[in-house]
A protein has these predicted regions:
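Thiol-/selenol-based redox modules, centered on thioredoxin-like
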Residues: 32, 156-188
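Conserved redox-active cysteine motifs that mediate thiol-disulfide chemistry
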Residues: 70, 78-95
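Acidic helix N-cap motif at the loop->helix transition within catalytic regions
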Residues: 117-120
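A short beta-strand-turn-helix
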Residues: 48, 53-74
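Short, internal strand/loop/helix patches
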Residues: 108, 122-160
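Active-site loop/turn elements of alpha/beta-hydrolase fold enzymes
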Residues: 112
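N-terminal targeting signals for export/organelle localization
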Residues: 1-53, 176, 188
């Protein structure tokens, strides 16, 4: 009698186990594949704050200072290759740069503590090759001066060198609302 109960339970539990395992695998796959949407809101600062100056190297080891971009609206983004939202927002940053690049606007992407060869290899794997300026904050001094507490963090700086907007987390930079904020600053 005990053997029959065991066999009945065993045969009943195997299909239930298979169904449960399948549902678990399916939900794990769905959770892995679904990514939250990127935001688009840039938070205005209550009043403009002067952007801290800096000088950093690009991938060609040439120095760039924030003051080199005075007179332009600057979208400045702190990022890293290991940061998934940073990687997801990179194509929209390039599209924005291509749309507005010129005398009044530029994009600066400041990489956090990674070496140039690694970043160069990473950018070669992207669907879109970034043509905006990529700088390296190898010791985090610049990110500390901007009080960056998480990646990605983005600042929108006006033509006078004042921080006007800030965003923490991934953004869809070519969203019409972001473009509107940039155009307003470009017209000031």
């Amino acid at each position: 009698m005990h053997l029959n109960n065991y066999l009945n339970n065993k045969f009943l539990s195997l299909p239930l186990l298979a169904i449960f395992s399948g549902l678990l695998a399916l939900s794990a796959f769905a959770a892995w594949d679904v990514q939250p949407k990127l935001g688009y809101n840039l938070t205005p600062l209550p009043k403009p704050v002067p952007a801290p100056g800096f000088t950093l190297e690009d991938m060609d080891e040439e120095n760039h200072s924030l003051k080199d971009f005075h007179g332009k609206v600057v979208l400045m983004n702190f990022w890293a290759t290991w940061c998934p939202p940073c990687r997801r927002e990179m194509p929209s940053m390039e599209r924005l740069y291509q749309k507005f690049n010129g005398d009044n606007f530029t994009v600066i992407a400041i990489n956090q503590m990674e070496d140039g060869d690694h970043v160069f290899a990473y950018t070669g794997q992207l669907d879109v090759d970034p043509t905006f300026t990529i700088l390296f904050d190898k010791d985090s001094k610049v990110s500390n001066s901007y009080r960056v507490s998480g990646l990605p963090t983005t600042f929108l700086i006006d033509k006078q060198g004042n921080i006007r907007y800030r965003a923490i987390g991934g953004r869809e930079f070519d969203h019409p609302e972001v473009e509107k904020q940039i155009m307003q600053l470009m017209q000031e």
